[in-house]
Amino acid sequence: MRETEVTRKTNETDITLRLGLPDLTRDGVVGIIDETARVMEIYTGVPFFDHMLHAMFFHGGFSVDLRAVGDVEIDDHHTVEDVGIVIGTALREAVELHGPVRRFGHSVVPMDDALGEVVVDAGGRSYLVYQATYPQDRAGRFDLSLVREFFQGLSSQGRINMHVLGRYGDNGHHLAEALFKAAGRALGSAFLPRETVASTKGVL
């Protein structure tokens, strides 16, 4: 398994992540070849965010052990943003450690009334396009405006061009979940291994 570990500690958050990148399994599915080695442990202190991250990593075929302690007694913002930063850092470092990836990924995912679409280019250029209008401000106690902050942190530190598009939805929870699942599937495809660099320049 292509793995990387990242630790980030600030005055606001303390985060550790061990991330395993997906491969193509024997039956052509994006995932961990040795399923017994796959870990799905996520704890950020923000339950709804944990749920979204689990959906993202599960459907992307990743293995993940993520632990975050943040100042959630003040606000969830620092934890959500910093987790995005750490995940982006791990993805970037995984490429540096383990070699070229396929680079591009695209996924459209429905969740009942909602439809989410995510397109990624892991080509070394950070840029986020985020278009999502939530019919409610919150999903339970979670501020849905923080979804953008998460993807901004992931995109910037991962040096990934991401287009995160909430096409429509009547339920904020469903729309956010569709976006996280689509992001996982798009990232899983983009970070599959390949033998040569996916660029006419020869480098990323």
Residue ranges of each PLM-predicted region?
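N-terminal intrinsically disordered, cationic/polar leader segments
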Residues: 1-204
